[in-house]
Amino acid sequence: YKWIDKKFSDEIKFTNINPDFIGINSDIKFPEKNHRNNFKKINNSFNWKSLDFKFVKDLENPKKNQLFYNPITDFNAYDGLILGFRLHNKTFKNKPSSVNIIPLYSSLEKKLIGTIQGIYNFHNEESSNFLTQISLRTQTYHYAPNLRYSTYKPTLNFVFRPDDFRSDIRKLLSFSWLSVNRDRSSSVQTDPNYGIGIIE
């Protein structure tokens, strides 16, 4: 741990210090909007951070990629008792991207079911369309004995706000497509699959 005092320069050169990582404002003593990019791992070409698993949602640690897990129990008529967990990276502060993975086990069908969702946010503070969001959600369960259904829902959201930043008014324009794929039942002759376009 070494404090380097260098004034009036945009470039700092390090020699023979062999660091594990380089941090700027590492103790967060100075307020800033985004401190996620304040740490650079050395000898890591992808700048991957180590994973930190937490049971309860916590304050963000900019040195690590945090994943939170929670146990889940549920029940429905075709899957019976459902057991599993939720794994996600959402913290109290909004992130550019988030994942939500929910692997579950159907006690009645003895098979894996669950949900996966990924969201990516594009922020533009200079525009009334200050947030554009792309997401993909897929899930699979059973709708009859030994018959599975799966849904896929890509979504594109445009979020608008007025020029007055003190206003809490928000407007949303949303485009999504819901695709439903079902295992074919011998008792039903029609195609069980369908898709729906949604504009909100």
Q: Where are the model-predicted features located?
A:
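Short, well-ordered strand-loop elements centered on a beta-strand within folded domains, enriched
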Residues: 1, 21-23, 99, 130-136
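Large, well-folded core regions of big proteins
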Residues: 174-185
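A short acidic, often aromatic-flanked loop/helix-cap motif at beta-alpha or helix-coil junctions
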Residues: 141-145, 182
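Low-complexity intrinsically disordered segments
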Residues: 132, 171-173
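Beta-strand-rich binding/interaction modules
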Residues: 1-26
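Generic surface-pattern signal
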Residues: 123, 139-141, 161, 178
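A glycine-rich helix N-cap at a beta->alpha junction
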Residues: 127, 132-141, 156
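Outer-membrane beta-barrel initiation region
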Residues: 12-14, 25-128, 146, 153, ...
